Structures are given as C-alpha cells and as structure tokens.
Amino acid sequence: MMVATDRVSAFDRKLGIEIPDKGKILTAISAEFAKLADNWGRATAYFYADAPCPDEVNDFSLYQFDSYRVIRDAPELAGRFTFMANLRMFPVECIVRGYLFGSLWKLYEQGERKFCGIELPDGLVKGSKLPQPIFTPTTKAPEGEHDENITIGKMVDILNKAGLNGERWTDKVRMAMDIREFCVGLYQKACTYADGLIIADTKFELGLNSDGLILFGDEILTPDSSRFWDAETYVPGEEPKSYDKQIIRDYLAEAKARGEVNPTLPAEIIETTRERYIELYERLFGKIWPRE
C-alpha cells in the first residue's frame, strides 16, 4: 500500500511543513495517469477501482479482510492510499527531460554539454525545449544527500549488482534500454495528452513484478515528481508559470540567498502551492476538485 501525505520536501530534505490536501491531490493525479498509462501500453503496479481485478488481489482475497475495510474506511487515509503490486524496485531514479531546467540548466550554464552520455548543442537558454527528450538516470542517494547523474553504462553496472535476476533479464543492457524506452515513451504520451500544459521533466520509479515484467511504481506524473508549465505563457529564457513544487523551491532559494537558515514557508506560499496543484488536476483531467 502506498500512502501520500501532505508533507513537503525540497532540495533532498524534509521541511516539516504540510500543504493541505496535497496527498489527496497527488493520489488522484497518479491514479488518473496510471489508468492512462495502462491504456497507452505502459503497465503500472496500480490497482484501481474500475480495473480488472489482478491475480495478486484475487489470490490474496484482499477485499475479504477486516484490515482492508479498516484501511479503506479510516478517515485519515481517505483519498490518500493506493494498493499496488509488490515490485522489486530498480535502485535508480529514471528521469526524462524535455526542457533545459533545474539542475540540468545549472550545469549547462557552467559550460557542461554532455549529460548522462548525451551531448546538448550550444546556444540554449534556461527553459529551452531540447531537440528531443533525454533520459538522465540518477542514483538513489540516502536521505539528505544528492542523487548523482549516471550514464546508461553506470546504470547497467548498478542493475547487475542489484541481483535482479531471472530468465527474462540475464541481459542487463537490454533491461536498461527497455527501462529508457518505457520512460521516454510514457513521457511523450503524457506530453501529447496534457493539452495547454508543458511537462518539462519528470521522474519515474520502476521495478519487476513476480513474473519479471517491468512496471511503473510509486507516483506517476505528479507535481511532486514533475515540472508542469503553462504552455500559453511559456517563453524560453523567462521563468514559466509552474504548477508544481517550483514555487517552494524558488522561495527557499531566495531565503537562502538572504542568509536564512532552515526557513519556513509563509501562509501565502502554502496556499498558492495548494491552488496550483488543484488547478493542475482540473486542467489535466477536466474534473472539479472539491474545495472546502
């Protein structure tokens, strides 16, 4: 079971702050994209209400257990939890980037042009659309430490050491290539779907199920794991209107520049972030979020 809370993290640290309803919004967005991903031929580990009942659920008789009913009816978990197939997760984070932003832009600005084995051209500006989406995997660093960009070759080494064996995946180079294809493919499908919005980049996490199939796990295309921009106001080189955690990142970066240590988020930043998350959900799926 995966539970999404209202807690906030940024720059690889937990802030001890909550955004009201954030966990529910993330759960709803992930569930909607899980359904879309399955329709697009990108299988996920999600069990959702109107999906055919998976064998894992039938075998487990999940819905007959009192503990399930307790979880389902617990008010503190309402709208925040998702049942998922058990996966052996890959020890890498799978990032797809369609635009030059964030840590990639910082390195590019410093003169770097090769990222995870991929060469980018000169002359790009912050927020430029890349010639094509690029796959930039990273390590999974311990909490408080920064993830490290890695090449596909390094990713293969990590997969070899992870013990993810079986008849299907004796060739870890093929596994890495398939992971890349799955991630870039889902990103491209989502970009086409998200009319009026730009998905600048996103982070996926994947794993193997009991049959050795690669499935998407964890959150999928949420504003916590992705950057969403308003397409109408997007101008390369300018700060885009974002519907994600960038509002929080920008405030914390400004606070750090002012010399503040462990700054807190003011009420207006918290409320703006909540409203942007809600607006994103409504724009993506054409549904109204119940505001209280």
Where are these regions (language model features)?
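A short glycine-rich, hydrophobically flanked beta-strand micro-motif that places a catalytic Asp/Glu
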Residues: 44-51, 192-208
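Catalytic activation segment of kinase domains across protein kinase-like and atypical kinase folds
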Residues: 204-246
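A long amphipathic alpha-helix within ATP-dependent nucleotide-binding catalytic cores
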Residues: 167-200
